[in-house]
Amino acid sequence: MDCGRDYCVKDLSLADEGWKKIDWVSRFMPVLQHIRREFEEKKPFKGVRIAATLHLEMKTAFLLLTLKAGGAEVSAAASNPLSTQDDVVAALAKAGVKVYAIRGESKEQYYEFMHKALDIRPNIIIDDGADMISLVHKERQELLDEIWGGSEETTTGVIRLRAMERDGVLRFSVIAVNDSYMKYLFDNRYGTGQSTWDGVMRATNLLIAGKNVVVVGYGWCGRGIAMRARGLGATVIVVEVDPIKALEARMDGFLVMNMKEAAKIGDIFITATGDIKCIRREHFELMKDGAIMANAGHFDVEIWKPDLEELAVEISNPRPNVTEYKLKDGRRLYLLADGRLVNLVAADGHPAEIMDMSFALQAKAAEYIKDNHGKLEPRVYILPREIDEMVARIKLASMGIEIEELTEEQKKYLESWEHGT
């Protein structure tokens, strides 16, 4: 472990490999490149301190470097103990980001490093799962007066923050970047859809075609996972608690059933709910020999490991990122990535082109907080639509796509109530 005054990483000598990764993905992130050039010129964050808790891999590194290019003092810690890429954080440390993260860090180190990232006394927090914002409210309340606001990347985090707002304990404004069109329509659906299966296939090296895939949760992440499973040739079964989403899944052409029925026939199970104990003892007891489980939600609580451990007579690791639970009756159940985010633990996370849009929103959310914090109340906000549209237009331009514009006549027609049948 290499630790200095402003960093704690596995090995600083890995930085060159980290730079190669960052350079590679930056070539496929034209929107964030555009914003970085803008930030380098205008320095909107001069004198501003930004602390981030994110999955510290190559795309998030480019976001942090973009904020630093805008004049910010930047610190960072991991939002998941297993998603850190050690070479990338070494590169960040060499670049002057105050970074504290080691792949495989303990729970104690996880929070110790988060505290270190908060020691810069941030004005803005960028969160992924709301752990840092929660920690500030619980244990670092002396920082609250200096915090202008924060932003949140994930569905899970937004749920937690809305609960804080509802309970009257949220002390500063937070931008729910996750709830922006350019986030959930693309990152949650196409990003999670592709990267989840990337993680499953890297971890197992097994065929998806012909298998029964059970997708637990049919939000935007679940939609993407189900869509890509069908594209890979699987029979897809959706498990839902929301009758509207369940009906939508059926109309989209997927089978829909409850978890107990799905447990009997599933070959691969993917959770994407943001909730606890979605697959538990009563379901493990029904699964066929060789069933594989993976989680695409933020926390490792959706597939309930304590029940698996109680049922198992033997636990082993036949492959990296695969845990085998042998049950009393001889059945073997497999859990990928220790029940954590399979796309980030067993693979490299979402494609760069997707995170280009999400992190462009994060960069602009930070700028929005800096410019408007005096007018914002301690509640959860959504980014203004014009920022969504700006990101979409830059992305389209980078793809060589020119869209139609409304004529003045069309605008007037849409604004009028007088024209009828």
Swiss-Prot record:
Q: Which organism is it from?
A: Pyrococcus horikoshii (strain ATCC 700860 / DSM 12428 / JCM 9974 / NBRC 100139 / OT-3)
UniProt subcellular location: Cytoplasm
Q: Enumerate the residues binding NAD(+).
A: 154-156, 188, 217-222, 240, 296-298, 343
This entry carries the following GO cellular component terms, namely:
cytosol
> Which note does the record give on the cofactor?
Binds 1 NAD(+) per subunit.
Protein name per Swiss-Prot or TrEMBL: Adenosylhomocysteinase
What is the role of this chain? May play a key role in the regulation of the intracellular concentration of adenosylhomocysteine.
> How far does the signal peptide extend, from start to end residue?
none
Gene transcribed to yield this protein? ahcY
Q: One GO molecular-function annotation for this sequence? A: adenosylhomocysteinase activity
The protein's required cofactors = NAD(+)
